[in-house]
């Protein structure tokens, strides 16, 4: 039993051991030079006796062992040369067995045994069997481990495998396998026994030291994996059962985990696939404290890579029913290991799903089965709070999205939304964003109402308002990014069949209406434009389609009216007004005058009742005027009503400059530059004159309040309108009108500057330059400008 001591004591004992080896090695080398066999055996035995110490930790003992190992290599060279020691190798093999102590005797016997096998004077299997049996005489765990490690090392190149020099009638591959298996079994027993050395108070230190020695045991499995001639049949019938028997029976957490890891890594993937049932059965028999999920994950990764290596091997997976066996094994492990945390179970499901997607991507039923098993496990937990487990669930849900380029495939998985239901609000949003990003990345088009229903159920975390407390904590930038993503998603929903597209719009609308006041301003506009696009599609196909359930422009406009009306209660009147005007223009294109008039009515009501901000009013009136100017569906009465309203509101804006610009913008309502457009030159002139009066009043107010009339920009803008309508052929706009306005602007500029410098306004200068250019250009237009004097 190794006594407990400090690091300083161990260093001292190690130094003493090394000194002893060096001292005896010196005399051994002197005897080697003299070819004195008796002295060589004497001092080599004394040198190897230093390895009998029990005072050193495994790491220190390894340092001592390596010093002795270097000397043993020199000794082996001496034993090979019979001319130097004068004894046949058979006699030498007998002679070294007379060494006084068993540990030096066994090291010498292994060294001579290596030479004996190489001489081929006896079948290698007999010598190997003799050595592996006699090594049982050393039962101290650390000393025995290093002795058997030495035996494995000196015999590695002397195994009777196929193609080796030692293969023959008396020697077979099975003999080599039997030797390695027997040595492995004994080494594993010694390794496991180390934990029982010393008091239990230093168990953690002992486990660490045992972990450092694991490679000595694992090398045997590595050798087994490299022996030429171990075919699938031998592996299935002999190698794997013997190894797994030792793994299961040792009942040691560290040994079971490490040896299962070795088995998976050192043997071929094809062998794993053909012996999958046996391997998985062993996994379910491991100690509950063994981290089985890592073992199974490594196995599935190996098999997945094997499947990806060549399409020709995929039929093998179907033949052995790999998915069913893995699924059953994982279910048993999760059910039996009651202490396994939820993150462990989720990790196993992620690995199984990854395996399924790589090996059986076409079997959606397998994918759904994995998700279903995940739902069952999650349902057994009151609430999923483990962040690591949540991360694994996200990985589970992300895997189908990454595998299938078409998101529609994932939407057919019935258990997918059931898994998402177990996520918390924050993670649910993260997953919903991943789904939307996947759709954008693959440019997928969701084309049926049923699939849209499933999709919006999946992303409901982004669509519905959170609790008030959570809503306040939400970062505004993140919130906007989420809602913009939903808006982009709505544009990806499309179907060439109008009836199905209308169903999609209704499904989306039903979900979006639950969004609350913060979300609607982001999500309603894309829905409106999607519906307007459908209206224009119907119009291009010939208008209304018969049938009560058919998609018709009138029906769609009714839905749009109800949808936009919700925005007014948010409140978000400016956005609602813009959308009403868009719908009015679409109704005009469909030649639906009453519908277009109703949308304009709603827009004017919003302007009157909801929009109070002066800047918003200016923007709104220009939008109304611009839209009304483009619409040609109205009859005389309706158009007069709407234009009268627009010009009236324009003249009642708060600021005089805003009034002026809105009024001269209204002039375009009476002159539409289309063959069939209205051309009322008289009313155009009235608007421009009214704008001129307002501009004049603005100049006077500026002069009264600031002492100067200020810039003449408004007059120049009105001048440009005169020039526009003059060139368009309005008979009521004459050269004299333009001439008078130019003179007015010059006078205003002179009075403001107090001198005779004119044309200091760049806009006015550019306007005059344009008139001059047209005059010089000549032609009909040039002649029209001739009366104007600059």
From Swiss-Prot:
Protein transport keyword on record: yes
Coiled coil location: none
Keywords: Cytoplasm, Endosome, Golgi apparatus, Membrane, Protein transport, Transport
GO cellular component: cytosol; endosome membrane; Golgi apparatus; retromer, cargo-selective complex
Domain of life (superkingdom): Eukaryota
A Gene Ontology biological process term: protein transport
InterPro entries: ARM-type_fold, Vps35, Vps35_C
Tissue specificity comment: Expressed in siliques and maturing seeds (at protein level).
Locations listed in the record: Cytoplasm; Endosome membrane; Prevacuolar compartment membrane; Golgi apparatus, trans-Golgi network membrane
Membrane topology term: Peripheral membrane protein
Subunit structure: Component of the retromer complex which consists of VPS29 (MAG1), VPS26 (VPS26A or VPS26B), VPS35 (VPS35A or VPS35B or VPS35C), VPS5/17 (SNX1 or SNX2A or SNX2B). Component of a retromer subcomplex consisting of VPS29 (MAG1), VPS26 (VPS26A or VPS26B), VPS35 (VPS35A or VPS35B or VPS35C).
PANTHER family registered for this protein in UniProt: VACUOLAR PROTEIN SORTING-ASSOCIATED PROTEIN 35B (PTHR11099:SF6), VACUOLAR SORTING PROTEIN 35 (PTHR11099)
Family, similarity comment: Belongs to the VPS35 family.
Function: Plays a role in vesicular protein sorting. Component of the membrane-associated retromer complex which is essential in endosome-to-Golgi retrograde transport. Also involved in the efficient sorting of seed storage proteins globulin 12S and albumin 2S. The VPS29-VPS26-VPS35 subcomplex may be involved in recycling of specific cargos from endosome to the plasma membrane.
Protein name (database record): Vacuolar protein sorting-associated protein 35B
Protein's organism: Arabidopsis thaliana (Mouse-ear cress)
Gene: VPS35B
